[in-house]
Amino acid sequence: MEINWWPIIAAVVAVIAVAYYRFTRTYDFFEKRGIPYYSYVPILGSIWEAILQRISFAETVEKIYQAFPDSKYIGFFDFASPIVMIRDLELLKSITVKNFDHFPDHRSFDSVDRDPLFGKNLFALRGDRWKEVRNTLSPAFTSSKMKAMFVLMRECAKEYGDYFASLPADQTTLELKDSFTKYTNDVIATCAFGINVNSIKDPKNKFYVYGREATHFGRSQSIKFFIVRSLPWVARALNIRIIRKQVADFFQDLVAITIKTRDEKGIVRPDMLQLMMETRGKLGPGKDLTIEDMTAQAFVFFFGGFESTSTLMCFAAYEVGINEEVQKRLQDEIDQVLEDCKGEATYEAINDMKYLDAVILESLRMYPTIVAVDRLCVKPFELPPHLPGKKPYIVQENECIWIPIYGIQRDPQNYPEPNKFNPDRFYSDAKQMLNSSSLFTFGLGPRMCIGNRFAILEAKVLLFYIFAKCNLLPCAKTSIPLKLNKKGFAMTSENGFWFNIQPRNIKKGEVEKITVPGKTMFIEKIPDRHPDN
């Protein structure tokens, strides 16, 4: 029987035409409204260079940000979605703080059923539900809770400091990211999920293996993420999940079993899970956190702490490692703290370390863990003219604006010599600078990252013990200058973070015994600083 191909061809052409129209119908959006906009490629939009891995996502954000340097805001296309990128700092402050009620939400993940770990977490929640959950979680980050979690962090960090200082002579060249993610994994496991793991001794533990899979945004994971966020109808049609079901089930089962065990045995721990358990029956009818809700909140805490914080520590260690004067000044401050505290750093002492604070904040400025963040308009808001003499623009409900964090923090108008690592920018008052309108790493206003104090403390404690015990020296594999990875949308180094790890020689002739998994070694002792070793 002869097949009539014409109806099939016509149907295919029609589908392609409809899809093309759907992808390109918005590309006159900014031209109609008189707003300057960044060039685009049909379907891929203005971020095509990042999607095709020509440049990193951070560099894409910076290029868009710099395209119209005199404009308060500019347009660009996230695939086919028109987005207004806000450049003016006062306008950003107005949007995120004073007029927060116009922009209270992020674009949500249209995947609550497929991906509850993303769809139900605090970052994705909107409106009253976001307020309820944030108010529930906020007590987890009070000073008293942070002080309790600091003790857990310190024990993990001391073990990693000892591990670094006792590497065999033929294994002292190390890529930092692997070790740092193991540390953040162990800290989050105990502080959020209430379980103890040791990823140095057991690098194949399920918590670490599944956590690494869930938070590692390589090429395929990043594409899935952007499709779910920017093309939800495609995600629905293809049933795309960001997190593999087996991984999501592992974390949910872990939370369910932990809660059941605590209820049955009367176990109480100072962690986020305990805090959520204690809200049961107190939030009102239909508002209690389900096991799925609790897992989603614990997971987003894990997601931010595991990948983002480990990356922050890598960039900070990289800059300290390649800047000898910075390393010496930091180690002098660390040595003084250890001397004052009789070898056991306290929560208060680490919080009062001005130079360590400055190193962390300068690292966050140069390498923000999130290079851009969105806000969704829920009621019309008038933007001033983008240039003098131009018309104002009214952002309508369901339209989206972007905060170009990487662009702002690399702008010489905001930070002179922006590509130079200079902790002294933040030395005078680091805590005040963390909330400044030009340092958006953790956001600004009510939607500011709830876990920012935890993330900074987690990074500070590890860096404290690494540099107390070791010097980081550039090696043949150290990438100078650093090149950002083009694969995926997470900010990291293209060639890893390679350094030679050298135990510090504080006083010749004295040694201390260090025990690490599988062996005992002797290294030169740091006098009167680690009496517990």
Summary of predicted features, one role per range:
Residues A372, I403-A430, I514-F522:
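Conserved cytochrome P450 K-helix/beta-meander segment immediately N-terminal to the heme-binding cysteine loop
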Residues V18, A50, I83, F207-G284, ...:
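Cytochrome P450 catalytic core segment centered on helix I
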Residues E324-Q327, N452-T492, Q502:
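Cytochrome P450 heme-binding "Cys pocket" and the immediately downstream C-terminal segment
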Residues N121, P139, K390-P392, W402, ...:
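Cytochrome P450 heme-thiolate "Cys pocket" and heme-binding signature region
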Residues M1-I16, F76-V84, S144-E155, A165-T190, ...:
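Cytochrome P450
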Residues E2-F118, F123-E132, L152-D162, N198, ...:
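N-terminal membrane-proximal hinge/A-helix region immediately C-terminal to the signal-anchor transmembrane segment
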Residues A50-D70, D253, I257, G343-G389:
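Conserved cytochrome P450 K-helix E-x-x-R motif and the immediately C-terminal K′/meander segment
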Residues W48-E49, T142-S144, T184, I243-L312, ...:
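Conserved cytochrome P450 catalytic core segment spanning the I/J/K helices
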